[in-house]
Regions:
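N-terminal anchoring/stem segment of glycosyltransferases
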Residues: 1-67, 74-81
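Short catalytic/ligand-binding loop motif for oxyanion handling, primarily in non-cytosolic enzymes
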Residues: 15, 45-47, 94-98, 102, ...
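Short, hydrophobic beta-strand segments that form beta-sheet elements in well-ordered domains
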Residues: 33-41, 85-86, 91, 107-109, ...
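GT-A fold catalytic core of metal-dependent nucleotide-sugar glycosyltransferases
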Residues: 69-119
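Catalytic core and acceptor-binding pocket of nucleotide-sugar-dependent glycosyltransferases
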Residues: 139-197
Length: 197
């Protein structure tokens, strides 16, 4: 099984990458062939033969997170060389071994810990009807998902990435930024296309 790990490390977040990749190498899906795709605005030296670096322009917040799916779409062909791909926030840590059977689903998302404490009507879906991330108050929702870890089969992930990138671009054309940036767009997508894991 081939897995592609996606990470964005701009500004100070570059300091977390080495430890994240160490954790992934030691504890994530043992036995799988893992390649990492790092999106960064830093000029960095080679960090291993299993890491591909994709340089991105330095942009002010929130662009690096808002446009993450746009970055992923640009590396579509590389990602599709793998069976699964997963996005990790650069400052994540893996404390225990994560087996492939625990995480390899068609489309994978992580419930947001803080948002899950609230009644569904108080979870912070984007309620702005001008945004393509819009979720009406009366729409049935199940879970609010965190943007820091998600993935799945590459075909499913790329399909999600293409839809989100297109919606982000259309919002930006209309001078709209979703409430929680890419996470708001991801939640809109996952309401219509629920994760399997």
């Amino acid at each position: 099984m081939k897995i592609c790990i996606l990470t964005i490390a701009t500004n100070k977040y570059i300091q977390f990458v080495e430890k994240l990749y160490e954790d992934i190498s030691e504890k994530f899906c043992p036995g799988a062939e893992i390649n990492c795709l790092l999106f960064t605005d830093h000029e960095i030296e080679e960090i291993g033969d299993k890491v591909k670096v994709h340089y991105i322009d330095h942009e002010p917040w929130p662009m690096p997170t808002l446009k993450r799916y746009n970055y992923f779409v640009k590396e579509r062909d590389f990602i599709l060389e793998h069976d699964y791909c997963f996005y990790f926030d650069a400052d994540m840590r893996i404390d225990n071994v994560v087996k492939s059977e625990e995480v390899c689903g068609d489309l994978v998302a992580t419930r947001h810990g803080y948002q899950s404490l609230h009644d569904k009507s108080q979870q912070s879906f984007d309620r702005n009807p001008k945004s393509l991330a819009y979720v009406p108050f009366d729409q049935e929702t199940v879970t609010y998902y965190a943007g820091g870890f998600n993935g799945g089969k590459t075909e499913n992930f790329i399909e999600m990435a293409e839809v989100i990138a297109d919606r982000v671009d259309k919002d930006l054309t209309n001078n709209v930024v979703a409430l929680w940036h890419d996470e708001s767009h991801m939640n809109r997508y996952l309401i219509d296309n629920p994760p399997t894991l």
